[in-house]
């Protein structure tokens, strides 16, 4: 960890979103509200799926884990960002920085793989409906979930090992609101070649694999739906995929913009905005996207309300 007389800094200074004093408190209030909504909606959806027997299906097992990932994702990033709005000296310990980056990569890859598994689930449900109950059993679903968490953990170890090889002799100011790899590469005083290669290979392997699985799944879904003769059948099939497609487009669209655009278009200020979107905003939007026009979730909420407050809702008991 040392290079000559260079020693690892005990703290890093985060530049935050802005250095404008007049914007610190308004931004604090905005992101506190977003974080509160994120936790309430995601934890609420987790609880609803847990208590309602009608939602004990593969699709909702995966959605429950997606909500957990989003709540954890936001918690890894947002509280420290909120603190930087209130602190004059916006510091994070070296260990805290490493742990934040490890958790960030772990949850990013977990979400990416979850979206791929959810696409496969929709493929089996639409293209192989008769075999769906035997293919997507609860045991299979939980094995898939456990496997993707394990793979994401291994990937995060590889990423973090690349970060641990870096030295920071000349600067400890991270031009970001959290410990992401790009601004850390920028201030590294040691060669980043090996670390960068580790990050690119491991990141591309999982994220691109996820995107390929999603694309292949939806090619087969579209081919199957096109062959359905009734308009109602086509609408029902596509409607089960709409929420997932929106979530995939938001998450992977942002990730592709962040990491696959031409080098000449890279800008840390632009990266801050993009990072803000997929670390803070998307975790808030996902439960709303999956619940907004979801009849099963709405019915489950009615049943829970009816049970809790002791009145009968005809729609809830149907």
UniProtKB/Swiss-Prot annotation:
Superkingdom in the source lineage: Eukaryota
Statement: the UniProt record of this protein carries the keyword Disulfide bond: yes
Keywords: Cell membrane, Disulfide bond, G-protein coupled receptor, Glycoprotein, Membrane, Olfaction, Receptor, Sensory transduction, Transducer, Transmembrane, Transmembrane helix
A Pfam family it matches: 7tm_4
Disulfide bonds: 97-179
Glycan-modified residues: 5
Extracellular topological domain residue ranges: 1-26, 80-100, 165-205, 261-271
InterPro entries: GPCR_Rhodpsn, GPCR_Rhodpsn_7TM, Olfact_rcpt
Topological type in the membrane: Multi-pass membrane protein
Side Cytoplasmic, residues: 50-57, 121-139, 227-239, 293-318
TM regions (residue ranges): 27-49, 58-79, 101-120, 140-164, 206-226, 240-260, 272-292
SUPFAM superfamilies: Family A G protein-coupled receptor-like
Protein location: Cell membrane
Annotated Gene Ontology cellular component terms: plasma membrane
Sample GO molecular function, one term: olfactory receptor activity
Family as reported in the entry's similarity comment: Belongs to the G-protein coupled receptor 1 family.
Known function: Odorant receptor.
Protein name: Olfactory receptor-like protein COR1
Organism: Gallus gallus (Chicken)
Organism placement in taxonomy: Eukaryota, Metazoa, Chordata, Craniata, Vertebrata
């Amino acid at each position: 960890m040392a290079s000559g007389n260079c020693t690892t800094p005990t703290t890093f200074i985060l530049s935050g979103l802005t250095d404008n004093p007049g914007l610190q408190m308004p931004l604090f209030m905005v992101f506190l509200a977003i974080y509160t909504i994120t936790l309430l909606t995601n934890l609420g959806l987790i609880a609803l799926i847990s208590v309602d027997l009608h939602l004990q299906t593969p699709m909702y097992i995966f959605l429950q884990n997606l909500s957990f990932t989003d709540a954890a994702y936001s918690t890894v990033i947002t509280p420290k960002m909120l603190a930087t709005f209130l602190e004059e000296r916006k510091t994070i310990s070296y260990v805290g920085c490493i742990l934040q980056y490890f958790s960030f990569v772990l949850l990013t890859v977990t979400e990416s793989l979850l979206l791929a598994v959810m696409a496969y689930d929709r493929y089996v449900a639409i293209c192989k409906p008769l075999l769906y109950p035997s293919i997507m059993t609860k045991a299979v679903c939980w094995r898939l979930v456990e496997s993707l968490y394990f793979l994401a953990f291994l990937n995060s170890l590889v990423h973090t090992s690349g970060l641990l090889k870096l030295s920071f002799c000349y600067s400890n100011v991270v031009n970001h609101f959290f410990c992401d790899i790009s601004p850390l590469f920028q201030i590294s005083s040691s060669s980043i070649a090996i670390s960068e290669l580790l990050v690119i290979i491991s990141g591309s392997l999982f994220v691109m694999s996820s995107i390929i699985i999603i694309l292949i799944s939806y090619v087969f879904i579209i081919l199957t739906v096109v062959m359905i003769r009734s308009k109602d059948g086509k609408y029902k099939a596509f409607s089960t995929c709409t929420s997932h497609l929106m979530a995939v487009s938001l998450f992977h669209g942002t990730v592709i913009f962040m990491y696959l655009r031409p080098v000449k278009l890279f800008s840390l200020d632009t990266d801050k905005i993009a990072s803000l979107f997929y670390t803070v905003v998307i975790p808030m939007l996902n439960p709303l996207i999956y619940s907004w026009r979801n009849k099963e979730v709405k019915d489950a909420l009615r049943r829970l309300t009816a049970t809790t407050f002791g009145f009968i809702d005809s729609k809830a008991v149907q």
